[in-house]
Amino acid sequence: GVWQFAYMIAKYTGRNPLDYWGYGCWCGLGGKGNPVDAVDRCCYVHDVCYNSITQGPRPTCSRIAPYHKNYYFTGKKCSTGWLTSKCGRAICACDIAAVKCFRRNHFNKKYRLYKKNIC
């Protein structure tokens, strides 16, 4: 869920998770236009990942699951134990991929709290 994603961001990037809220055109709720840089592209890919597990004829998760569904992870891996559902593992995989992407790319302060109307 949201809190687990926030924890991952803080732990693996060393940044406050709120730094990513409103970053560029895609970080935070919704998104439009072209990503402004590599970090914003991480958010775009994260949105695409969530869409892939919540849409289509046989979705793995409900549309709201990514915001409340708990999952289990150790280190940088999603748990495959009996406590974690298929949906939870899918959400976890999307979140871990995003965090690894954030960590690989430069955070540019000029894109924090970016004006979405220019996207």
Swiss-Prot record:
One of its GO terms (molecular function) is toxin activity. It catalyses: a 1,2-diacyl-sn-glycero-3-phosphocholine + H2O = a 1-acyl-sn-glycero-3-phosphocholine + a fatty acid + H(+). Ca(2+) binds at residues 28, 30, 47. Its EC number is 3.1.1.4. Keywords: Blood coagulation cascade inhibiting toxin, Disulfide bond, Hemostasis impairing toxin, Hydrolase, Inflammatory response, Metal-binding, Myotoxin, Nematocyst, Secreted, Toxin. GO terms for cellular component: extracellular region; nematocyst. It is found in: Secreted; Nematocyst. SMART domains: PA2c (SM00085). The active site is at residues 46, 95. It comes from the Eukaryota. Binds 1 Ca(2+) ion per subunit. The keyword Disulfide bond applies. Sea anemone phospholipase A2 (PLA2). When incubated with plasma, this protein shows a moderate anticoagulant activity (0.15 ug of enzyme/200 uL of plasma), inhibiting clotting induced by thrombin. This enzyme also induces myotoxicity, and edema. PLA2 catalyzes the calcium-dependent hydrolysis of the 2-acyl groups in 3-sn-phosphoglycerides. Belongs to the phospholipase A2 family. Lacks hemolytic activity. This is Phospholipase A2 A2-actitoxin-Cgg2a. It comes from Condylactis gigantea (Giant Caribbean anemone).
